[in-house]
């Protein structure tokens, strides 16, 4: 993913700009950043994800990336700045340095660039996530110089380093805060747990010194470890855009400030209200810091799937140079390099085997546990593991072009997307924090006016509890964390969700429509029958038909040509070849006009096929696909091919039925053949004799009655139907997959992956609903309790300390629930 790219082929369509943001803590932050970005002229849309801490901005017209970054900073947040070191090739003088620096600084998202001629390195400071090496490389190449490509591991290392530093900082803050809060808590509340503590304090340091000591400890906690809340919360308050940090600041400052007045000028307070709440302020900060620490740890675990994918690629490869295999940095491997792989080693890049044979474990890519045999001309995938033999292969795709790199980009894109279910959360969080502040003010006023004596103390404590217990974080994390873990688990199972939205739409599917050839079947048909008409010799017909089919790319053509070769029948030259999709092929072979195709092709050309009606019925009833051959305008033969059903297909259909789905087969075969196959497999509906362009109409027909349709095909020939369906699922294997043609991609050819994807979709949406239910119920129920609605009933009041603990744990609960998807088992 480059920093700036067109979302479609047309240059008039919106451009996209991605970057990482620091400082967001809750759903209100997300709303605020999105609002700030959307206000920038030229911005078409802004999508900010709290879990990934990433923004995706689309522009209409000329992109104003600098204005977007300034808007984010003005809103109180910081685009994350990272440093990249890249090797520049071809520089010879200071002018080269200036030229390269200028080119790099022009890349959207680059804050600064410094180039060193002596080391031939460029140090680039850029907004994290906004520009990858590919974008920088394009700029340098445009200036006339070369650049060494980076690996995805480098970008991941930056993210890991950032999270490690954040965890270290939070751990330190929790430790310091706890060490100061514990004695403070004992000074104020110790007598409730340990008899004699109060008398001991009175007899040693006295009440006045006790208050001074509490003041000192609470102040150190608030403006030491707790300073992070003030740095973010106060500016947002001043901008009238409060967030969760603002709620913490208001609550703790109110408790601390009231206590300061009690300590130093108690005379100004009403009689009986001179109480201190230092321990509440300190414990609130400490508990929320603990929650942040646990939350940060959990967030790191949600992205482990991406880290594992990045970690699949080795750092070096043994490349053939001058007759010897030399260990080479992976960044220096180029297309065409010959690479040696020994048993147990990881395959570094995509390629084609040139020598040797082995079995390769591709489970980390396809989800299939059985090793795949590789021999000369076999394709190998970067990141997979060589098991037994030694092989040599030629690199065909390297760097960001490898299948592994594509998978990583797809998973990242899916994890950063928003589901339709998120819309409600966005609407609520837009006003959540301001409403909580208003609720706290109303709580204070109600208790001050209507509460028992001392009214001021009751008013303060309950208002602080309301401010502290409200948790927009849980609402903001509810959806994106489940998406992150769910799509990550899907990748481990060999399932790629190209769009996060497909997680929700797939769950709603009623009918699964399956293309027969290559999906239900192996896609490798075999010639089973050839019955010649009177006056024609079978071998003569096969020679003419096979010769014609050598120019066709259809799988059936390959079956006919292969059968001719196995019988020792040589093919001859063809002229005037013509292929009509859905009908057949025609041409001139040895001076004779030959036509091969479905019954409709011959009927269209006025050729009577009734002479083979009985044969056609027999072959079709056996699940074979009959074709006809005409020579010089006469019916010459009926040919039958059979495409074996995949071993996994029957179980896959049973699994889909078990999930409550109807299964429909869409095929170009005649109805008799299609129904025979459907009956054998237990398929519910059949749409037969469909031309390639008719698959879209077939999907529309299946959708009648308000049904949601998922269409499964090979992702290339079925592209229009995949696009028309509510969910398009492409089934492929390895590098043959057409990733861009569907919403969901199954990396293996096993149709059981569809049932796994559906089950995971249902589990993920269920997990999201659980999170949202918790987040909303938590806030709807506990905010009124914190305000004191139960006090008139049974005298219950919620301490600000318990409010802080509940708030801290609410986000951890959401993250913990989302992490359960890591162990999802579709079996």
Swiss-Prot record:
It is a multi-pass membrane protein. Mg(2+) binds at residues 714, 718. Keywords: ATP-binding, Cell membrane, Copper, Copper transport, Ion transport, Magnesium, Membrane, Metal-binding, Nucleotide-binding, Phosphoprotein, Plasmid, Repeat, Translocase, Transmembrane, Transmembrane helix, Transport. The active site is at 515 (4-aspartylphosphate intermediate). One of its GO terms (molecular function) is ATP hydrolysis activity. Cu cation 1 binds at residues 26, 29. Residues 15-80, 82-148 form the HMA domain. CDD domains: HMA, P-type_ATPase_Cu-like. It catalyses: Cu(2+)(in) + ATP + H2O = Cu(2+)(out) + ADP + phosphate + H(+). One of its GO terms (cellular component) is plasma membrane. It is found in: Cell membrane. The chain crosses the membrane at residues 174-194, 210-230, 248-268, 271-291, 430-450, 458-478, 541-561, 569-589, 727-747, 773-793, 795-815. Its EC number is 7.2.2.9. Involved in copper efflux. This is Copper-transporting P-type ATPase. It comes from Sinorhizobium medicae (strain WSM419).
């Amino acid at each position: 993913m480059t920093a700036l790219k067109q979302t479609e082929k047309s240059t008039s369509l919106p451009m996209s700009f991605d970057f990482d943001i620091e400082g967001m803590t809750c759903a209100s932050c997300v709303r605020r950043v999105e609002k700030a970005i959307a206000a920038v002229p030229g911005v078409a849309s802004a999508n900010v994800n709290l879990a990934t801490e990433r923004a995706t901005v689309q522009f209409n017209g000329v992109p104003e990336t600098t204005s977007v970054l300034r808007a984010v900073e003005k809103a109180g947040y910081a685009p994350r700045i990272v440093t990249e070191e890249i090797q520049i090739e071809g520089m010879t003088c200071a002018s080269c340095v200036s030229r390269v620096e200028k080119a790099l600084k022009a890349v959207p998202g680059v804050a600064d660039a410094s180039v060193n001629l002596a080391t031939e390195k460029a140090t680039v400071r850029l907004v994290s996530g906004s520009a990858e090496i590919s974008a920088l490389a394009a700029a340098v190449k445009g200036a006339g110089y070369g650049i060494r490509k980076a690996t995805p591991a480098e970008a991941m290392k930056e993210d890991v380093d950032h999270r490690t530093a954040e965890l270290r900082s939070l751990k330190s803050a929790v430790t310091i805060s706890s060490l100061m809060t514990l004695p403070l808590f004992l000074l104020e509340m110790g007598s409730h747990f340990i008899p004699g503590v109060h008398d001991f304090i009175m007899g040693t340091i006295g009440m006045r010194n006790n208050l001074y000591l509490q003041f000192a400890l609470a102040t150190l906690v608030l403006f030491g470890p707790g300073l992070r809340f003030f740095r973010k919360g106060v500016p947002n308050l001043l901008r009238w855009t409060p967030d969760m940090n603002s709620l913490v600041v208001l609550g703790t400052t109110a408790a601390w400030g009231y206590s300061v007045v009690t300590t130093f000028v108690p005379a100004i307070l009403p009689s009986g209200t001179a109480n201190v709440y230092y321990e509440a302020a300190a414990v609130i900060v400490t508990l929320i810091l603990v929650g942040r620490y646990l939350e940060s740890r959990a967030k790191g675990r949600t992205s482990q799937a991406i880290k594992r994918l990045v970690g699949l690629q080795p750092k070096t490869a043994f490349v053939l140079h001058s007759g010897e295999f030399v260990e080479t940095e992976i960044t220096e491997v180029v297309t065409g390099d010959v690479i040696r792989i020994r048993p147990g080693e990881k395959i570094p890049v995509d390629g084609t085997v040139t020598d040797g044979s082995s079995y390769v474990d591709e489970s980390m890519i396809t989800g299939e546990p059985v090793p795949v045999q590789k021999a000369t001309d076999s394709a190998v995938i970067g990141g997979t593991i060589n098991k037994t033999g030694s092989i040599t292969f030629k690199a065909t795709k390297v760097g960001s072009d490898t299948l592994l790199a594509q998978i990583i980009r797809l998973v990242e894109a899916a994890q950063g997307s928003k589901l339709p279910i998120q819309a409600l959360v966005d609407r609520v969080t837009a006003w959540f924090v301001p409403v909580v502040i208003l609720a706290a003010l109303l709580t204070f006023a109600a208790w001050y006016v209507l509460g028992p004596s001392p009214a001021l103390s009751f008013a303060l404590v309950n208002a602080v509890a309301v401010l502290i217990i409200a948790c927009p974080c849980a609402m903001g994390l509810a959806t994106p964390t489940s998406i992150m873990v769910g799509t990550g688990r899907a990748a481990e199972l060999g399932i790629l969700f190209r769009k996060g939205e497909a997680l929700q739409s797939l769950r709603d599917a009623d009918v699964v429509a399956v293309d027969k050839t290559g999906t239900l079947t192996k896609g490798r048909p075999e010639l089973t029958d050839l019955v010649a008409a009177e006056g024609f010799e079978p071998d003569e017909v096969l020679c003419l038909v096979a010769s014609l089919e050598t120019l066709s790319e259809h799988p059936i053509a390959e079956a006919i040509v292969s059968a001719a070769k196995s019988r020792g029948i040589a093919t001859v030259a063809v002229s005037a070849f013509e292929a009509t999709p859905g009908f057949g092929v025609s041409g001139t072979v040895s001076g004779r006009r030959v036509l091969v195709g479905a019954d409709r092709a011959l009927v269209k050309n006025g050729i009577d096929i009734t002479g083979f009606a009985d044969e056609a019925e027999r072959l079709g009833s056996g699940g074979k696909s009959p074709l006809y051959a005409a020579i010089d305008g006469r019916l010459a033969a009926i040919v039958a091919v059979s495409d074996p059903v995949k071993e996994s297909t029957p179980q896959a259909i049973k699994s889909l039925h078990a999930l409550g789905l109807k299964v429909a087969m869409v095929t170009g075969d005649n109805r008799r053949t299609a129904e025979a196959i459907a009956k054998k497999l237990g398929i519910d509906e059949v749409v037969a004799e469909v031309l390639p362009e008719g698959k879209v109409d077939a999907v529309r027909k299946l959708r009648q009655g308000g049904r949601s349709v998922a269409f499964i095909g090979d992702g290339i020939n079925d592209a229009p139907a995949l696009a028309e369906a509510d969910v398009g699922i492409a089934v492929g294997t390895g590098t043959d997959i057409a990733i861009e043609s569907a919403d969901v991609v199954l990396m293996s050819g096993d149709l059981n992956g569809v049932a796994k994807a559906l089950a995971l979709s249902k589990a993920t949406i269920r997990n999201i609903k659980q999170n949202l239910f918790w987040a909303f119920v938590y806030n709807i129920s506990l905010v009124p309790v914190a305000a004191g609605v139960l006090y008139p009933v049974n005298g219950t009041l919620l301490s600000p300390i318990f409010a802080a603990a509940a708030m801290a744990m609410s986000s951890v609960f959401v993250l913990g629930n989302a992490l359960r998807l890591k162990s999802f088992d579709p079996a």
